[in-house]
Amino acid sequence: MFTVLTRQPCEQAGLKALYRTPTIIALVVLLVSIVVLVSITVIQIHKQEVLPPGLKYGIVLDAGSSRTTVYVYQWPAEKENNTGVVSQTFKCSVKGSGISSYGNNPQDVPRAFEECMQKVKGQVPSHLHGSTPIHLGATAGMRLLRLQNETAANEVLESIQSYFKSQPFDFRGAQIISGQEEGVYGWITANYLMGNFLEKNLWHMWVHPHGVETTGALDLGGASTQISFVAGEKMDLNTSDIMQVSLYGYVYTLYTHSFQCYGRNEAEKKFLAMLLQNSPTKNHLTNPCYPRDYSISFTMGHVFDSLCTVDQRPESYNPNDVITFEGTGDPSLCKEKVASIFDFKACHDQETCSFDGVYQPKIKGPFVAFAGFYYTASALNLSGSFSLDTFNSSTWNFCSQNWSQLPLLLPKFDEVYARSYCFSANYIYHLFVNGYKFTEETWPQIHFEKEVGNSSIAWSLGYMLSLTNQIPAESPLIRLPIEPPVFVGTLAFFTAAALLCLAFLAYLCSATRRKRHSEHAFDHAVDSD
């Protein structure tokens, strides 16, 4: 009898079921893993959002001859043609006089800054304090102090540097800027605020405006005055008053000159010294620019302890002697006398000369007059643009007033300024008309302005714009739809799952082939028997 060896149907069905279920599970897991991997990769790549790289801040202290003003500026860290789009966010006036008045007590300068600096700390996010640059630029007052007493000027700057190094900001130094730099930075500020460098197009992108004419800048401080503009004619490039300025990818050839000792305060000292020189009496004088019924006494030192008037000192000079000036409120005589502080004859009627023999190309285009120019026009109840006749008639009317009438005319009455507005107005007339050569036709092109929008017209903004050329731009930030740790973890998990499924399926395929091979061998053995 023979025994037949064969697999029962039940056994074969059980083996097939044993392999089929894991295979289906592995295929499903593999398919799901592939779908998830493709999906999160597509989402991560195509749904990412490009964010602006945030804001940067900068602080500039404008240390003028009569006061110090602190400005806080901000701009996008990603810049336009290497220059930041800067805006003013905060302004604080330091109490007291300018830093040049601390020549005899430089250790007291930091105390004056403290109140404003505490406010500034609240304007800049605390986590950005360490990366926020702070600069102090001193102007004509310190330029004069350096010429008069370099040691005192250096001690004032050293005291300032010591103070700011203890502050949380990135202190970049305290320096005395040149008159030429002051003029250029003022010109940059004026044109930037008026949109002559950049404007937003329909797509809200910053672009250079086509065919826009730049605006000249007229700045009046306490110790100096500046004029800056792009001339229309060929300029004498051999003079030091020609500068090239690069902003937002464009280069501008600029004429700029700073007149030391012709700021409002120093010019008035020159005027008082001239009155003393021409007076038969040396202790009681009349002043045609002071209002009627007003008198004031100064020491000789107040008038002559300045480099701007030292050459006008009388022979018997004693800084403690007292001089009394009595106002006569004479508009005609005031206008005549003020002209004498300028040396117009030095130009010998040359068209390309302003005064004191200084070269100046012919003026061209619109101008903005700010700082002291604006405040004087405002005292005359004038602002914006107006005719030369209007300016002259307003000056005449103001200079004709009694002292008791001035508080009624001035919104903010301050004796120091009120007594001098008549002088300042006549000073502006001679500077603009006989010096810069503005005429009845070109005068209305002068716009007397204090600020544009929320930003003051001051050299400090132009200084900040220039500095942003040297501050590296940051790349835009990319915000991903899936946080990187989650994305990496998910990617690793489903990649591992897919690989395990592939390995398992490969194992099943190999096991199936071995099984079939053994079945084939078994059947062959049975047939042989």
UniProtKB/Swiss-Prot annotation:
Effect of residue 182 to D: Complete loss of activity
Active site: 182
GO biological process: nucleoside diphosphate catabolic process; nucleoside triphosphate catabolic process
Names of the cofactor(s): Ca(2+); Mg(2+)
DNA-binding found in the keyword field: no
PANTHER family: ADENOSINE/GUANOSINE DIPHOSPHATASE (PTHR11782), ECTONUCLEOSIDE TRIPHOSPHATE DIPHOSPHOHYDROLASE 3 (PTHR11782:SF38)
Family affiliation: Belongs to the GDA1/CD39 NTPase family.
Name of this chain's protein: Ectonucleoside triphosphate diphosphohydrolase 3
Gene symbol of the encoding locus: ENTPD3
